[in-house]
C-alpha cells in the first residue's frame, strides 16, 4: 500500500472524510511520522484505555493538535445511518484521577492542548516536536516531549499542566520518566523504563497482558541499554517458564540481531552495534504470537554484555 492518509469513508457507517477534527488528527500522525518521530506500534485504542506510552503519546498529541489548529476543544466523530450519530469529547477536560498518567491518551491530549495555549506554547510545542522529540534516544512519550519542552518555556510555566495529569513538574522529568513510578496488579513502585548499563539487571523485568492487546500498558517493557564502545553485544533474557521476545532500537530505528538463539526459557540476541544509547522492547513471545492466556504475567532475568 502506498504511503498516504487513509481515512474511513463508508456512507451510513463512518464518514470520517467529513469530520474535520478526525482529518486533522490523522494529518497530525502524518506530520509526526514524516517531520518529527513516532515510535507508536499503532493499533486499536479508546479513551480510558491504559496504553503503551508510545501509543498514548501519539494519539493524544494528534487529538490535541487537531483542536489547537482548529481553535476548538471539541472533537467530533459522526457515524451511523445518514451520519445521524456522533461521538464527542473535549480535549480541554481534565481527566479523572484513574485516567491520569503517561499511559493515558486523555492525559496527553489535555496536557498538549493546555501547553499550546500558554504564552509561546504553540511555537514551543512545534519546535520540540521537530528537534528534541525527533532525536531523543528514549522511546517517544510524554516524558521525552516534556524534557525537550521545559527549556523552551518560562520556569514553572508548565507545572500546573503536568500536575493536572498526575506527573511531576517538567523540570524534574527526564526523557526516560526517571522520576516517575506506577503500580501494576503484580507489583508497585515500577519504574517507567528499566535501565541496564551492563551486567545483570538488579530486578526481574516483567510484562503483562492484563490491560489487553499488544499496544497496551505493560505488554512491552522498555529497557535502556548503554553501549560505551562499538562491537558485538549480547542480550540474554531468561524466563522461569516463558520465552522472551526482544526488539532493539536506536533513536527509533530497529536494530536487527546478527544472531538469535531462542530455546525456552532462554533468549540470546547478539548485535553488532555502534556506541550509543539503545532501547530494548521486551515482551513474552506467547503474547507477541497471540497464544498467551488472559491475565498472564511473565518475568525475566536480563543480562547485557559485550561479546567482542
Predicted region positions:
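C-terminal edge strands of extracellular/lumenal beta-sandwich accessory domains
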Residues: 178, 182-196, 221-226, 247-261, ...
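Short pre-active-site segment immediately N-terminal to the catalytic Zn-binding motif
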Residues: 7-23
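Catalytic glutamate of the conserved HExxH
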Residues: 22, 26-34, 60, 64
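Extracytoplasmic/secreted cell-surface and envelope-processing proteins
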Residues: 15-16, 31-32, 39-42, 289-291
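Short proline/glycine-enriched turn/loop motifs at strand-loop junctions of beta-rich domains
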Residues: 229-231, 239-243
Amino acid at each position: 500500500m502506498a504511503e498516504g492518509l487513509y481515512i474511513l469513508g463508508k456512507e451510513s457507517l463512518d464518514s470520517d472524510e467529513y469530520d474535520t477534527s478526525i482529518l486533522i488528527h490523522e494529518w497530525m500522525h502524518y506530520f509526526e511520522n514524516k517531520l518529527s518521530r513516532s515510535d507508536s506500534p499503532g493499533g486499536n485504542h479508546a479513551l480510558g484505555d491504559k496504553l503503551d506510552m508510545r501509543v498514548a503519546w501519539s494519539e493524544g498529541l494528534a487529538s490535541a493538535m487537531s483542536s489547537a489548529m482548529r481553535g476548538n476543544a471539541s472533537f467530533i466523530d459522526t457515524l451511523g445511518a445518514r451520519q445521524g450519530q456522533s461521538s464527542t469529547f473535549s480535549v480541554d477536560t481534565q481527566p479523572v484521577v484513574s485516567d491520569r498518567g503517561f499511559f493515558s491518551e486523555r492525559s496527553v491530549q489535555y496536557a498538549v492542548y493546555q501547553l499550546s495555549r500558554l504564552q509561546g506554547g504553540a511555537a514551543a510545542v512545534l519546535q520540540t516536536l521537530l528537534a528534541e522529540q525527533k532525536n531523543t534516544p528514549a522511546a517517544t512519550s510524554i516524558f521525552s516531549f516534556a524534557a525537550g519542552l521545559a527549556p523552551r518555556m518560562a520556569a514553572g510555566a508548565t507545572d500546573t499542566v503536568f500536575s493536572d495529569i498526575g506527573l511531576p513538574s517538567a523540570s524534574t522529568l527526564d526523557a526516560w520518566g526517571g522520576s516517575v513510578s506506577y503500580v501494576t496488579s503484580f507489583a508497585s513502585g515500577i519504574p517507567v523504563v528499566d535501565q541496564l548499563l551492563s551486567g545483570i539487571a538488579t530486578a526481574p523485568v516483567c510484562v503483562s497482558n492484563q490491560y489487553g492487546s499488544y499496544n497496551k500498558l505493560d505488554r512491552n517493557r522498555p529497557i535502556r541499554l548503554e553501549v560505551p564502545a562499538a562491537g558485538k553485544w549480547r542480550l540474554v533474557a531468561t524466563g522461569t517458564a516463558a520465552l522472551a521476545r526482544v526488539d532493539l532500537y536506536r533513536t527509533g530505528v530497529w536494530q536487527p540481531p546478527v544472531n538469535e538463539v531462542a530455546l525456552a526459557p532462554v533468549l540470546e540476541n547478539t548485535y553488532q552495534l555502534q556506541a550509543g544509547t539503545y532501547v530494548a522492547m521486551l515482551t513474552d513471545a506467547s503474547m507477541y504470537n497471540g497464544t498467551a492466556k488472559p491475565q498472564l504475567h511473565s518475568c525475566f532475568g536480563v543480562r547485557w554484555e559485550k561479546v567482542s
